[in-house]
């Protein structure tokens, strides 16, 4: 009997189910990414904002708020998102934090592997727009600085990407290589510097958790590491500007002590 059960819904695409679920059922929504936060940043990247763009942003924001209020409980992945959520929906009760998890297996027991010369990796599929933005930003903004420093490297992109998108970037940035799906992500990442140039979104970046578990050094942005209590220069390198990001990549690639 569904009325005696707890119903858990996850991901923004299914958020509207809250309008359909019975009132006398315990309902939980797990919000992996606050969509209006992502949209708020995306719209600032438009070459030109129209009144229609702003109207659609506010419509989507109002929908997200009203749909979330239909659930008895809401779970977010970070304390940062929990505080934002409290202000967003106007209540502090029934909002909980539950960090993302990754499969550990035997990765913690595996040895650290020093970075191979100039090998960079990025984990994420194109269908999640913040990943596409991250790779495009790295190519257009960071790679020119790496080239100026005569830094020889390859960037291996792991995940599902359309051929035409990668081909378009590769025509200008041949350092970019599509690795696609890899069966053993932890082993594949070893010996690389992971780059996480995320500028958009909320929640917790699984790619950072994977890098940590695989004992892989990484460079990220403040947005990329948001919600995770990592310190710049101790746990990773955190840089937001393209030139600084390039310098951090070079430093990690060439300094075995810093890699640890």
Which positions does each model-derived feature cover?
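Acidic donor-binding loop of glycosyltransferase active sites
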Residues: 72, 175, 189-203, 214-217
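Conserved catalytic-core segment of nucleotide-activated headgroup transferases in glycan assembly
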Residues: 87, 97-190
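Donor nucleotide-sugar binding/catalytic pocket of nucleotide-sugar-dependent glycosyltransferases
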Residues: 26, 54-61, 65-107
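Short acidic/histidine- and often glycine-rich active-site loop of Leloir-type glycosyltransferases
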Residues: 222-233, 237-238
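Short, small-residue-biased leader/transition segments that mark boundaries at the very start
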Residues: 2-3
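Acceptor-binding helix/loop patch of EC 2.4 sugar-transfer enzymes
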Residues: 25-65, 125
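Short hydrophobic beta-strand element within catalytic cores of glycosyltransferases
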Residues: 207-211, 217-221
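Conserved acidic donor-binding segment of nucleotide-sugar-dependent glycosyltransferases
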Residues: 233-243, 250-256
